[in-house]
């Protein structure tokens, strides 16, 4: 039996895309893999163990070594700044981080309020712009903040822009593009470099347009 590779995977839409990518790379995952409600899924025939986590927690699991590798959004990596290796851009779950607000709304006072679940990214961005702002951290329904007067603007993930439009908000600034990345724990990479390199190579072939034989 070979070395078992433990992977942290984000629950939700990214998980389904990532599972599809692994299948394309030739990994035999159970048919019910995506529908499973288990938080730990063992795939012994591939020497793989999957830990299903909230997207914002994947980098934490990998940094602390409870997972050897993982798939995480670049947004989470920028926000959390964990000590992990970014091995490969998987080019899935494409979206971008943006500033948005009500159309025609002026900045409020000296330090406008910015609502976001990415306080570190938002602070860094506005600091680079030379703007002093007050950051308000929220965990969800970020679009609500300008509508109820909690914030002047928001910093959030934009995919299709539909949620902004439905709430009467407009995007005013594009911060950066986001995709999901294959990340690795530095110590695990030294111990399991062969299996990790093989997975990275197989995934890279799929990303570059080839399919596993």
Swiss-Prot record:
The keyword Cytoplasm applies. Pfam families: HisG (PF01634). SUPFAM superfamilies: Periplasmic binding protein-like II. The keyword ATP-binding applies. One of its GO terms (molecular function) is ATP phosphoribosyltransferase activity. Its EC number is 2.4.2.17. It catalyses: 1-(5-phospho-beta-D-ribosyl)-ATP + diphosphate = 5-phospho-alpha-D-ribose 1-diphosphate + ATP. It is found in: Cytoplasm. It is an enzyme of class 2 (transferase). Keywords: Amino-acid biosynthesis, ATP-binding, Cytoplasm, Glycosyltransferase, Histidine biosynthesis, Nucleotide-binding, Transferase. Pathway: Amino-acid biosynthesis; L-histidine biosynthesis; L-histidine from 5-phospho-alpha-D-ribose 1-diphosphate: step 1/9. GO terms for cellular component: cytoplasm. Belongs to the ATP phosphoribosyltransferase family. Short subfamily. PANTHER family: ATP PHOSPHORIBOSYLTRANSFERASE, ATP PHOSPHORIBOSYLTRANSFERASE ATP-PRTASE. Lacks the C-terminal regulatory region which is replaced by HisZ. Heteromultimer composed of HisG and HisZ subunits. Catalyzes the condensation of ATP and 5-phosphoribose 1-diphosphate to form N'-(5'-phosphoribosyl)-ATP (PR-ATP). Has a crucial role in the pathway because the rate of histidine biosynthesis seems to be controlled primarily by regulation of HisG enzymatic activity. This is ATP phosphoribosyltransferase. It comes from Bacillus velezensis (strain DSM 23117 / BGSC 10A6 / LMG 26770 / FZB42) (Bacillus amyloliquefaciens subsp. plantarum). The gene is hisG.
